[in-house]
Amino acid sequence: MDELAFGEAALEQTLAEMCELDTAVLNDIEDMLQLINNQDSDFPGLFDAPYAGGETGDTGPSSPGANSPESFSSASLASSLEAFLGGPKVTPAPLSPPPSAPAALKMYPSVSPFSPGPGIKEEPVPLTILQPAAPQPSPGTLLPPSFPAPPVQLSPAPVLGYSSLPSGFSGTLPGNTQQPPSSLPLAPAPGVLPTPALHTQVQSLASQQPLPASAAPRTNTVTSQVQQVPVVLQPHFIKADSLLLTAVKTDAGATVKTAGISTLAPGTAVQAGPLQTLVSGGTILATVPLVVDTDKLPIHRLAAGSKALGSAQSRGEKRTAHNAIEKRYRSSINDKIVELKDLVVGTEAKLNKSAVLRKAIDYIRFLQHSNQKLKQENLTLRSAHKSKSLKDLVSACGSGGGTDVSMEGMKPEVVETLTPPPSDAGSPSQSSPLSFGSRASSSGGSDSEPDSPAFEDSQVKAQRLPSHSRGMLDRSRLALCVLAFLCLTCNPLASLFGWGILTPSDATGTHRSSGRSMLEAESRDGSNWTQWLLPPLVWLANGLLVLACLALLFVYGEPVTRPHSGPAVHFWRHRKQADLDLARGDFPQAAQQLWLALQALGRPLPTSNLDLACSLLWNLIRHLLQRLWVGRWLAGQAGGLLRDRGLRKDARASARDAAVVYHKLHQLHAMGKYTGGHLAASNLALSALNLAECAGDAISMATLAEIYVAAALRVKTSLPRALHFLTRFFLSSARQACLAQSGSVPLAMQWLCHPVGHRFFVDGDWAVHGAPPESLYSVAGNPVDPLAQVTRLFREHLLERALNCIAQPSPGAADGDREFSDALGYLQLLNSCSDAAGAPACSFSVSSSMAATTGPDPVAKWWASLTAVVIHWLRRDEEAAERLYPLVEHIPQVLQDTERPLPRAALYSFKAARALLDHRKVESSPASLAICEKASGYLRDSLASTPTGSSIDKAMQLLLCDLLLVARTSLWQRQQSPASVQVAHGTSNGPQASALELRGFQHDLSSLRRLAQSFRPAMRRVFLHEATARLMAGASPARTHQLLDRSLRRRAGSSGKGGTTAELEPRPTWREHTEALLLASCYLPPAFLSAPGQRMSMLAEAARTVEKLGDHRLLLDCQQMLLRLGGGTTVTSS
């Protein structure tokens, strides 16, 4: 390290001597700068040339300003500085070259930048002030001098090559500086520092240690605090003989280059302020305040306050940036999920993110599975073709269609993959694991997809089918039928042949009118041989003409679609798309796809009334011909009489496919999903039926039976009542079709073979609706199958019949147990129908029949089990009831979610009756009564919510209300002493019921009275339960006897006078009669009994009735009471 040329003592002495001069000079400079800043117009020549320089550059001697004539001499300035400092200047080699990036510095055009002249020597000393930045003024604004309150503190900093600074401090723009970012506000340095403060700072430099020799050359660093603004200052020491004061306005748009600053990293952001000048002892010190970004300074030079403020700002900025990134990230995810939803389920669907991702995963798995099947099929077809020789392939192509693979022989899943459907934005997938309400497909924005990859290598090129394979239109068919009918009725050939034979004779007679009559007679005798030969020839010609017409209609007029041909590919494509649309619920689009599928098969639907009439007439004629087996045999020869067996098989398969599509369109029409009148629907039904019969063994018997039943539905719906006998014919054909092949009827149609179901279908008053109403007693089946809706109506009919057997049995029932046995029979049939019918469990596929898409109906099964349990309780068959407890305890979820209170009333009534009818409990627990009260509350809510409900609702409400009353009565009777004791002692009534039990009984009785106002059969139970309530309350027995007498006498006079009155008032049943006898014999006082032995006779009659009803436990009780009354004798039934 080189020795310094001066010491600290010399610097302090020099500064002390010049203190007074410095103070005076600084005051003058401040006044002059104030005058210049406030009145620029008073010095017009000061900002003119040669001071006005428009360019910026280095502040060294090479600057353009050095050539100005009014510049100071650099040599004189250097000599003065050396004389002043007292030693030569040592300039070591720089450690590293400074960066050359310019800093933003803009000069006013009227002010020339300060440039040292030849006699002026410039020494840049960078000073770094490390404080947080303050707001930055706009460029080009002239800043007035500011005088901060606190003095500027200059930290000790080593100065290389100088003993001290003469006065003031100055700075210039360092090289390679940049404007700080807009997010980091900077404040300008003060324009002019106060003289005392500046003088104090300069004096404090004398006590600092010099820099070591290894420091950067010509570089000094001074740390200060000026209004919390980071400033980099580089001083210029100027010595002149005369005082020259200049002030230069700077701007951020200009750039100033310097040699470099060792304490600043390259790229430091700076800000230029107004140029400041300081004159002291003939030396001019020009300074330019700069603003330096604190982030570019060394960490160890940052002040504590700067660190705290900088870290707070950094955290806020990082948090803001993090939030912005997170927002963009979430927005990107949401956009992609929305796009994925549009691809998977379409734009109309509303799903959450989880459901969209789940469906996308399911569809991806489906695509992977499909690709796997396609690869396997491709390998199979490749191996099949490789096994054939070239000769076989050529011969197969020459024979026509030899390489076609039968569509019927393939597996269903292979057929599905061979002709994939078109994919649109909302289509679901073919067989998603979520079954068919949640299927999805990928969106391609196009109407169709390319053919399946399974045919890329093995599919035979579609051959151009012959014209006869395309089929005939229905108008042409009807014209041929009319021609054949005319040939059989009008016999035009006979007239034609007769005219041809008689023409020669007539001609000869005309030319020989004057001839002899004997010759004419001879000529006529010669033509007699044609008279007996002409009729057979004419009829033979007519027969041949009719056979030709039939052959054209059935054999050569039927369109035959060969597998893998162009029409077949289009057909399967539209059919699979129709399956997807049906699964998605887009029924109009599905009908459109089915229409296109029929058009691809060469069977377009009629588009005008004339076409519709022709098509309907042709289908009627064809069905009549097929009933005669002529049309069916001819249809079996479709494609040509001399064709091979493979073509006939393809013809049957084509007829099967067309029949299935016609059948599905008919179902859509029946459910209101396809437009058209009754004639169009009848035409669809007949077309499906005729083609299904022509398909032969190519169609399954279940599908054929379903088509027959659909035709019977159409007869019942569209035809007048006089033609409803055709319904029986079609149902019989369906049953024969099933029994002929397998000997069994599909589960979904077994109820049609039952007498009750057959009678309901033929004679029932029902109708198929497009939007069936919601029901509590059965779930809806396939929404596009009318037979499923009829089956649902039949299940509800069975439940209603079972309830009516209890509520209003037939008046001619001689057997008392018949009402219960009939009800249990209906319920058993309902259980079997519920096991085989319900919501679809497979698919909505066009080819799927009802037999393959049925499932259990848990709702109907639950109601049937509940009703059966109540009937077993009324019969006092507790063992049979206990077997059904598990089925009733688990209520279906559909009934739990409903808002109607009737299912909850049924469930709590079952629980309450189960607790109260338990004969092992003599006393009632509060919990049992609480459940009973809850059931009563739900029942009252049900009566209030459905004042005009259906008959099945009222029958179920009557059953539940009667069950609660019977359960309360049974509990009260168990709490009584034995009836024999009461009778022996002649008591009139037993102990009364508690207030809680009596209040609950009155509430249920009020519900029964309210129900009886709209449901007449409930009136019988009102009389009996009202008499029971009076007995429980201990009321006057007179009114009780009248109420019991109504139930006793109505049974005796079954055909009494006033038949109209008897019909209006419902007749009591055997069960009600028995209950009235027991109540009268056990609880009425002896005064109300007409004869002494009447009580015993009443008990004997009750015992006989109970025996008919099958209540063995009550029969045993009656016999015990008779034993006590008769003194050891028993009374049996006679």
Curated annotation (Swiss-Prot):
The record marks D451, S452, L480, C481, L519, E520 as: Cleavage. Induction: Up-regulated by endocannabinoid anandamide/AEA. The keyword NADP does not apply. Residues 424-453 have a biased composition (Low complexity). Activation by cleavage is down-regulated upon activation of SIRT3-dependent PRKAA1/AMPK-alpha signaling cascade which leads to inhibition of ATP-consuming lipogenesis to restore cellular energy balance. It comes from the Eukaryota. Disruption phenotype: Mice show high embryonic lethality around day 11 dpc. Surviving mice show a 2-3-fold increase in processed Srebpf2 protein in liver nuclei, 3-fold increase in cholesterol synthesis and 50% increase in cholesterol content of the liver. Residues 1-477, 558-1134 are cytoplasmic. Keywords: Activator, Cholesterol metabolism, Cytoplasmic vesicle, DNA-binding, Endoplasmic reticulum, Golgi apparatus, Lipid metabolism, Membrane, Nucleus, Phosphoprotein, Steroid metabolism, Sterol metabolism, Transcription, Transcription regulation, Transmembrane, Transmembrane helix, Ubl conjugation. Residues 367-388 are annotated as: Leucine-zipper. The keyword Protein biosynthesis does not apply. Residues 499-536 are lumenal. Changing S395A: Strongly impairs affects phosphorylation by SIK1. Residues 227-487 are annotated as: Interaction with LMNA. Residues 46-73, 130-149, 170-195, 415-468 are annotated as: Disordered. Changing S389A: Abolishes AMPK-mediated phosphorylation. GO terms for molecular function: chromatin binding; DNA binding; DNA-binding transcription activator activity, RNA polymerase II-specific; DNA-binding transcription factor activity; DNA-binding transcription factor activity, RNA polymerase II-specific; nuclear receptor activity; protein dimerization activity; protein kinase binding. The modification Phosphoserine is found at S96, S115, S331, S332, S389, S395, S448, S1047. Residues 1-60 are annotated as: Transcriptional activation (acidic). PROSITE patterns: BHLH. The 9aaTAD motif is a transactivation domain present in a large number of yeast and animal transcription factors. Belongs to the SREBP family. PANTHER family: STEROL REGULATORY ELEMENT-BINDING PROTEIN (PTHR46062), STEROL REGULATORY ELEMENT-BINDING PROTEIN 1 (PTHR46062:SF2). This is Sterol regulatory element-binding protein 1. The lineage of its organism: Eukaryota, Metazoa, Chordata, Craniata, Vertebrata.
